[in-house]
Amino acid sequence: KSEQSSFSSSSSVRNELSVYHNSRQKPPAEKTNQSSKNIGKKAAPFKKQKRANKGSSGAQVLYAKDSGGAQNESLRSNEADLAKKKNPNPSGDTGSSKNQDSMAAQNVHQKSQMSVETCTTPSKSNLILESLGLQFFGREVTLFRLKNYLTSERHSDVDDNVVQENLNDSRGEIPDSTPESKMHHKLVLPSYTPNVRRTMRTRSKPLEYWRGERIDYQARPSGGFVIGGILSPDTVSSKRKAKGNLGRIITTANRKRICLENAPIKNKFMVNLNIPLGDPLQPTRVKDPETQETVLMDLIRPRDTYQFCVEHDELKVYKTLDTPFFSSGKLIIGPLQEKGKQHVGLDTLVFYVNLGYLLCTLHETPYIVTTGDSFYVPSGNYYNIKNLLNEERVLLFTQIKS
């Protein structure tokens, strides 16, 4: 009896230990529903638990070796444990537990598909990892880096497409008449080089700013600016400008050298007059102030009827009008010639410089007179005129007689 009592006490201790161990594995709702009928059946789950622990350790080893399959298995096991904890009745219908397991497996499968959505195939992900030079430090870090890389590639592709569209638009806007288009040979377009980091910007070589070359910037839809082309204006040949300026200078110089005597006479009248005109070669009828009678006098002297007076070397004096009270005429002085000092007596001489650059001496004071200037010599004084240029010059004079 003593042996039986000791055996029964030892078996009861063992059963209590197994019940305590199983109570920690099951939810709290199952602790109150235990009975002595289940005492003999609790020794087997202890061994199964060891096997499950061994299986979980093996799953961890597989997870270290192969990330894809191990992660899926671990996720499925975790989902199954959560489903068991949520179900308080372990003796429930087997059909509901099967449905829950299938739903958990579907959720795990969907989550795994969403997590690996960025890289479609493992071979592509491995190639991308090798090209980026990344090592496996964890599934989340690797997927995050892959996602950033793929999004950056998409943005770069969009930017390249925008740049290409802008370049195509710039090509279409330029007319065919221009010799150089916006797509200049100085543009450096981005090139794709695998395994080498390159910029995706459109660059340009140094421009000839002195010729007016400028960069044509265009705005992107996403913001910022891109190079749309190079503007190169048409150049005008400098030879034409030089010829045109030279011709203008020559014509103005020739106009200045024209003498008034050789200037052509215009036979066209600006206004048609309907009145009778007198003959310039015939004398004109005028009234004598002393006798109050009408007399004939020569008042007009055409240029072909000038009276020649003096000619000394290149000095010429023409008298155009000669009356008892005054006389008028024209004085022509040759290049670098001098008229000479002369006394006017009791008369008065009035001069007008029609064309020239002269040195005029009035009594004892020299002056420089040019075209358009006038001067006169009073009675009883001397005067002298010298041409300072190497060209013929003309003066008009009037002599007032005393």
Curated annotation (Swiss-Prot):
PTM sites of type Phosphoserine: 5, 222, 232
Q: Which residues cross the membrane?
A: none
Which residue intervals make up region (MIF2 homology domain III)? 349-402
Q: Which UniProt keywords apply?
A: Cell cycle, Cell division, Centromere, Chromosome, DNA-binding, Isopeptide bond, Kinetochore, Mitosis, Nucleus, Phosphoprotein, Ubl conjugation
Low complexity bias locations: 1-12
Name the Pfam families for this protein: CENP-C_C (PF11699)
Compartments (UniProt record)? Nucleus; Chromosome, Centromere, Kinetochore; Chromosome, Centromere
**GO cellular-component term (any):** pericentric heterochromatin
GO molecular-function terms, A-Z: centromeric DNA binding
User: PANTHER family this protein is in?
Assistant: CENTROMERE PROTEIN C
What subunit structure does UniProt give?
Oligomer. Component of the CENPA-NAC complex, at least composed of CENPA, CENPC, CENPH, CENPM, CENPN, CENPT and CENPU. The CENPA-NAC complex interacts with the CENPA-CAD complex, composed of CENPI, CENPK, CENPL, CENPO, CENPP, CENPQ, CENPR and CENPS. Binds to DAXX. Interacts with DNMT3B. Interacts directly with CENPA. Identified in a centromere complex containing histones H2A, H2B and H4, and at least CENPA, CENPB, CENPC, CENPT, CENPN, HJURP, SUPT16H, SSRP1 and RSF1. Interacts with MEIKIN.
Protein name per the record: Centromere protein C
Give the organism the record lists: Ovis aries (Sheep)
